[in-house]
C-alpha cells in the first residue's frame, strides 16, 4: 500500500493540479503519470448544473464508445424461444429465464450487464432488490429492455457504456485504458461530451458543464477547462 501511496504522491507532483487543461493535454498528463503495474482504466467525472431532485433534470442513458472501453463485459440475457437463440448467436455469455433467476437468488453474479426482453420484466422485476443496488437492473432508457436483443448484446460487446447523474449531479464514466492512444481516448471522450450536451434538460439553468476531471484508476484527477470541455 505504501508503494501505491508513493506513486500517487509522485504523480501529484508531476503536474499542476489547479490548472485547467485542454482535453487532449489532460489525457496526455493522465497517461504520463499512470504508474500502476496494470492497465488502468481512464475515467471522466462531469459535475453538471442540474438539480436531480426534479424528475425533469435527471440524466441517464447509454452510448457506444468508438474505441470501446478496453474491457470485455459479460452479458446475461433474459429471453425465451427465438429471442434466446438470437442472444446466443449475438455473443451473449449467459441466456435463460427461470434458471438464471434461481442462480441469482442463490448469490450468483458472474455477469457485468443484464439485458431482458420486455415480456420477461415481470419475472426479472422480482430481482430488483438484488440487481438494483448493483446497477444491474435492465432499463429501457439504457437500451437493456428490448426485443432487439442481438443489437443490444453486440453494442455492449462493442463498448457500450451507461451513464447516470448521481444526487450531486455528477456523472462518472470510463473512456478507455491508459494503454489507449491519446487520440483514441479523446475520440471516446468527445462522443461522451456530445452525448451529455444533447441530454441537457430544458429545465437546467446556468452553466451546464460546471467541472470536468479525468483520472486513471490509481491516479489523481486532472482538471479540464469546462468551457473547452469538447
Swiss-Prot record:
Q: Which domain of life is it from?
A: Bacteria
Is the keyword Isomerase assigned to this protein? no
- Keyword terms: Repressor, Ribonucleoprotein, Ribosomal protein, RNA-binding, rRNA-binding, Translation regulation, tRNA-binding
Question: What CDD domains does the database record attribute to this sequence?
Answer: Ribosomal_L1
**One cellular component GO annotation, for this chain's record?**
large ribosomal subunit
Q: Give a GO molecular function annotation for the protein.
A: tRNA binding
Q: Which SUPFAM superfamilies match?
A: Ribosomal protein L1 (SSF56808)
Could you mention a single GO BP entry for this protein?
regulation of translation
| Classification via InterPro entries | Ribosom_uL1_bac-type, Ribosomal_uL1, Ribosomal_uL1-like, Ribosomal_uL1/biogenesis, Ribosomal_uL1_3-a/b-sand, Ribosomal_uL1_CS
The subunit field of the Swiss-Prot or TrEMBL record says: Part of the 50S ribosomal subunit.
Give the protein's function: Binds directly to 23S rRNA. The L1 stalk is quite mobile in the ribosome, and is involved in E site tRNA release.
Q: Which family does it belong to?
A: Belongs to the universal ribosomal protein uL1 family.
Q: This chain belongs to which protein, by name?
A: Large ribosomal subunit protein uL1
Species annotation = Desulfitobacterium hafniense (strain Y51)
